[in-house]
Amino acid sequence: MTIKIHTEKDFIKMRAAGKLAAETLDFITDHVKPNVTTNSLNDLCHNFITSHNAIPAPLNYKGFPKSICTSINHVVCHGIPNDKPLKNGDIVNIDVTVILDGWYGDTSRMYYVGDVAIKPKRLIQVTYDAMMKGIEVVRPGAKLGDIGYAIQSYAEKHNYSVVRDYTGHGIGRVFHDKPSILNYGRNGTGLTLKEGMFFTVEPMINAGNYDTILSKLDGWTVTTRDKSLSAQFEHTIGVTKDGFEIFTLSPKKLDYPPY
C-alpha cells in the first residue's frame, strides 16, 4: 500500500483548509438549538464555506444531496439534513469538509440541543477523550493499530462500543484516501506511520452495541441497530517529525460541549 507523503508546503495548505473547516463549526455553534431544522444549519454552513472561497465537499459527493452531515441521537454518521426541527434534549453531530485551494479539511463535533441528560453528555465526553487518546499516540514509527487500540480500550473501559463499519481515512488533495484508520485494533500491528502522512481520526462510539444499519431509503443514513445513542468527533491530522499536528483545532477553543 503506497501512502502519500506530504511536504512542508502541503502542511501549509492543510492548515488553511483545516482552519476553515473548524471555523465553520465555530460559526454554526450558536445556531444549534431546539426548533431549528438541520436544513437551516446546512444552508448556513454552505453559505459560510462558499463565502470563504471554498467548496463544501459532501455536496454531490457520490450523490450526497447536502453540504454537511447532521447525525442526531442514534444516527451514527452520514445523516442528511432535513426540515424536521431539532428537539430539546437531542444530541447532534455536525460533520463538515471543505475544499480550499484543492485541499480537504474534514472535522466534526457533537452538539447539545437545549438541555441534555447526563447519559448522552457522558457518551459525548468519552467519545471526545477517545479521539484524543487515539491522536496522542501518533508519531513516526507508531503503528495504525496503536491508534485503534487507544480508542477502543478507552471506550470499552467506559462500557461503550466502537463502531466497526466506518473508519477514518487518508486525506489531502482527495476526500477519502488510503489508509483506513480503524477505531479498534491491537497495539503494534498495521501500517507504520511516517512523517508527512495526513489522515482523519474519527471514532464513532455507541452507548449500546456496535452493530449498524445503512438506510435502504436514502442509501446514506447509518443508525445503531439497537437504537442506542451514538457520538462522534473528528480531526484531520498530519504526522510530524516528532509527533502530530491537528489541522482542525477550533480557533475559539470550542473543542467539545457545552460550548
Swiss-Prot record:
Pfam families: Peptidase_M24. A divalent metal cation 1 binds at D95, D106, E234. InterPro entries: Creatinase/aminopeptidase-like, Pept_M24, Pept_M24_MAP, Pept_M24A_MAP1. GO terms for biological process: proteolysis. Binds 2 divalent metal cations per subunit. Has a high-affinity and a low affinity metal-binding site. The true nature of the physiological cofactor is under debate. The enzyme is active with cobalt, zinc, manganese or divalent iron ions. Most likely, methionine aminopeptidases function as mononuclear Fe(2+)-metalloproteases under physiological conditions, and the catalytically relevant metal-binding site has been assigned to the histidine-containing high-affinity site. SUPFAM superfamilies: Creatinase/aminopeptidase. The keyword Metal-binding applies. Substrate binds at H78, H176, W220. Removes the N-terminal methionine from nascent proteins. The N-terminal methionine is often cleaved when the second residue in the primary sequence is small and uncharged (Met-Ala-, Cys, Gly, Pro, Ser, Thr, or Val). Requires deformylation of the N(alpha)-formylated initiator methionine before it can be hydrolyzed. This is Methionine aminopeptidase. The gene is map.
